[in-house]
């Protein structure tokens, strides 16, 4: 006869889950280089606690509700991770003992799967595969001892462990996002040289577009920038149409996710927006339309085929944001430079338009024919770029 858990045991489990859900956690949001300040501002607007910015990541404190809210609503962060520990690790023994000391059982159940990923820079422990093995062994030994198991099945939900070792200091994280946050779930297919959704959202943010102005991307490609502009105008949370790694964790009450998603939907705006995406390639434009439909914003975007160097400006004033082709990708460098020269001449008298153009071309201003009002260095993946701002 199967044993029925006592009311006391059930109450203990419920109390444990509640305590973990309510405890204060330190979380890290990795981001593309150059976006740290923007991500910090996003978190502050969400009223996250103790936000602090470091190179390529932003930390904040909060509970599971704050974690879920960040996952659902962040536009420019790459993922949300719980910081489990930080300790010196200049030897494999130190790494093993540091990981084994982490109370992983607070999060990972007896059947939880816990793969390990990580990296090491400027450290004595430079072999990433060896470090992965040590972290995994320490986690197995810890959980096995806590659950009284000599073998862990790992047949349940995934609790992705991540580590970083920098200058002999190890940090261990629990990844709550699963798939990176830049994957919104709307990219049905992509064309050559796509722009990360998080970077596209950053360009829209830098342009200060909020839905009132006319918005135009003359090189719209697969539509990422105009789709992110529409999501911004609608104040629609980018994570509403995707799932997250922590969404089915036993330690996170389902009510938390339901609450933050309902909250996000209640914050959406309703209105008419003037957003235009143009591209010279009809096949690419078809991809953009498909992506916009999948994102649920196709009715807010006008897609048209056309040459950016010949199209008439749609109106006297507006916001132009674009990622034009440059030499590292689709065009030879000279062709890309000539394109910028022609495009710059075409926009010579467009003084009513604020322009935000991202490019890896070091001499962009020379070819465009005008000094930028302001420049900002960013990385599109590993490619160093500048955002040239004209206003």
Language-model region placement:
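Conserved S-adenosyl-L-methionine
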Residues: 195-312, 328-329, 335-337
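C-terminal catalytic and target-recognition region of SAM-dependent MTase-like enzymes
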Residues: 308-310, 314-391
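Intrinsically disordered, low-complexity segments enriched in serine/proline and basic residues
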Residues: 5-6, 12-14
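A short, flexible beta-alpha/helix-coil linker loop
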Residues: 121-124, 180, 325-329
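Non-catalytic nucleic-acid substrate-recognition regions in nucleic-acid-modifying enzymes
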Residues: 17-157
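Methionine residue identity
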Residues: 1-3
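Short beta-strand/turn micro-motifs composed of small residues
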Residues: 31, 279, 359
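S-adenosyl-L-methionine
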Residues: 23-45, 52, 58-75, 129, ...
